[in-house]
A protein has these predicted regions:
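Carbohydrate-active catalytic/glycan-binding domains of CAZyme proteins
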Residues: 1-356
Length: 356
């Protein structure tokens, strides 16, 4: 099998250092693969550091990764900077605009539920902030994904927190939205069942979204939905992790899907395993905790904690989490018609798949 992609533990780069690129995305550029994401190496819940820039890794086989360092550095000195490390900035997503020949990076400020953009002449930077914080289509934004069609049109999919998924058309330069948008995947029960973290991919002319429920860093069941067009009404197909009895998407949250450029029908789901230290906690318990917490019944939750003697405390629902220990779950997607399945693999290789 040769080199393999391994799941179930921390990833190390070619120098043996722990990899830090959460909200992972992969780009294929000039014959190489580039994995990038939020650098959480100092985000242990006690430092006040939410992020330490955007880190990138390079690979020729998707199995071993060379650390290229920070392509977007934190601004340590200016507390008003959008890139100040104490600011709740996350979820980088980079897209190339053929017309402008610019690389465009979108990010969000989690606490303000606003987006901002940066641009660069090179994938590797330097990136320059090109907008202030804004509400896309005057809507609050949570986790998101970017995509472009074969004719060069760009779209953003984002969760309007606790209510629905929004698909908005990007401006020609990809640094904003035109104001045209649709909504889909509404969930009447809200938290913890409302959908977030949309990961888009396109296959055989159909558009797919993999989404998660709403339990913060704690994992939950995924859903996959399909549409005939980018801005269409997405129809839910079910949980792609149907073989996972824990109902936690293998203790992870899918962040993006990468289509291998040289392998036949190989789509790779990249997921964050935010809290490997809490994998023993049952979804059915914290699902109910989040439901109670969201509906502002905190006293009921505190009484329940005291009565049931749970191992984890209410503070674990806050942002004070040690996500410097976050890992990855990276798995191939299997298709049977419209059916989408993600099965657990301890180790696997892209070489198992036929060349195109």
């Amino acid at each position: 099998m040769g080199a393999v992609i391994r799941n179930g533990g921390p990833w190390q780069d070619t120098e043996g250092k722990r990899m830090h690129a959460q909200f992972p995305h992969i780009l294929y550029h000039e014959g190489k693969y580039y994995l990038y994401g939020s650098n959480k190496e100092f985000s242990n819940g006690t430092t006040g550091i939410w992020h330490w820039g955007i880190r990138m890794y390079e690979s020729s086989d998707l199995c071993s990764w060379k650390d290229l360092g920070l392509i977007i550095a934190p601004d340590e000195k200016d507390k008003d900077s959008l890139l100040y490390p104490g600011r709740t900035v996350d979820a980088p997503c980079i897209i190339y605009n053929v017309k402008t020949q610019k690389w465009v990076c979108w990010m969000i400020d989690m606490s303000q539920m606003k987006a901002f953009t940066l641009v660069s002449d090179s994938l590797f930077g330097p990136y320059v902030v090109s907008s202030d914080l804004f509400f896309p289509c005057d809507l609050p934004i949570g986790d998101f994904d970017l995509m472009q069609t074969e004719d060069g049109k760009g779209y953003i999919y984002f969760n309007c927190p606790h209510t629905k998924i929004v698909c908005a058309e990007l401006t020609e330069d990809f640094t904003g939205v035109t104001g045209r948008y649709t909504t889909t995947l509404h969930h009447p029960e809200s938290v913890p069942f409302s959908r977030e973290a949309p990961a888009h991919f396109c296959r055989e002319g159909k558009h797919y979204l993999i989404t998660s429920g709403t339990t913060a860093y704690f994992p939950n069941p995924s859903e996959v939905a399909v549409s005939q067009s980018p801005m269409g009404d997405f129809q839910v197909l079910g949980d792609p992790h149907a073989g996972d009895p824990s109902k936690t998407s293998f203790h992870s949250q899918v962040r993006s899907v990468f289509k291998h450029p040289h392998k036949k029908d190989l789509y790779i789901a990249l997921a964050d395993r935010w809290l490997p230290q809490y994998m023993h906690l049952p979804y059915e318990v914290y699902k109910e905790w989040f439901r109670i917490w969201f509906h502002d019944r905190k006293e009921e939750l505190l009484d329940r904690v005291k009565r049931e003697g749970e191992e984890y405390q209410v503070k674990q629902f806050s942002e004070e989490q040690d996500v410097s220990l976050a890992e990855y779950v990276v798995l191939p997607i299997v298709f049977d018609g419209d059916r989408v399945t993600i099965a657990w693999r301890d180790a696997w290789s892209p070489n198992e798949f036929d060349d195109e």
